[in-house]
Every structure is written in C-alpha cells, then in structure tokens.
Amino acid sequence: AVTFVSATPAQILVAGAGALEQAVVKFKVLAGTAPLANQAVTFSLTVNPGGVGLGSTGSTAPVSATTDANGEASVSVFSGTLPGPVRVRAELAGDATIFAESQNLTVASGPPSQRFMSLSVSTFNIEGMDRDGTPTTLTVRLADRQGNAVEDGTVVNFTSEGGQVASSCATRRVN
C-alpha cells in the first residue's frame, strides 16, 4: 500500500510573492504495517492550479524516487503563478493500481499590490461637518501582483485627515 504522510508546509505562496514557494510531499510504502525500503515510486500532479512544478520549478513531468529504510519517499513541489489546491499522486512503479494522493496542499496568493488596489465609498461628501456620526461604507478590493484575489483575513489599515474611520479591517472574499 502507498499512504500519504505529509505536505510540509501545507501552504506555499504563488511564485514571485517573496515568500516560501516550495513544499515537500512525503508518502510511505507499506506491506501490511511494515515499511518497504528500496521501492520505486512515481510522482505526478493530478491537480495543478497553474504553473506548479514537480521536482523542479515549472516541470510537470512525472518524478521517480526510491523509498528509504522507513519506506518513505518524497518529492518537492514548487508553486506556480495561480493560487489553488495541489494534489500529488504517488504510485508504486510497475503497479499503477497501488497509489495514494496528497491532501491539504495549497498555493496561496501573494501579498496585495498597490497596482491592483481600489477604494470606493457608498456616499461621497457625507454631511459630517455639522452632523456627528453620519456613516458611509468604504470598500477596498485587493489583489496580488498577478491579479489574484488576496487571501481572506488580509488586514487593511486606514487613516483619516478629517473625521473618523475604523483603523483597520480584514478582507473577506465576495463574489
């Protein structure tokens, strides 16, 4: 049997975001509960959000490895330019019916870019001069440098030269 062990880290950022762009995905080959050493394993991508590399940056070709004394084999996954889930399939070389797929590996969008930021208000020039507490809604749209929506929970800070505004808020994806 082939079993998925881990993806470390479970989240990497899109290429060029200036943060971690590589994860190691590990599988284990077992005979019952005993680990099998020196077994050839072939890795392939089954879900690729765009540009993800297997074994090296940008390569989508299958990669082979041999299990160690613990029955484990691993492969490096490199982020591409699009965010989304990634799945790696590990199969026993010579018997494609014995396989497992990775879980919980994600390529996340990068930090926001000023180039892809917009700010809008529900009401311009509110009656704030002689009326206290007149509200308006501010909407901020953010994307990373490739135009991908930023992750939920990205914090936006506000300042005001006149009047009052909440000091910060966290993003929430709205379709």
What is the predicted role of each segment?
Residues 1-175:
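The feature marks long extracellular or luminal low-complexity segments
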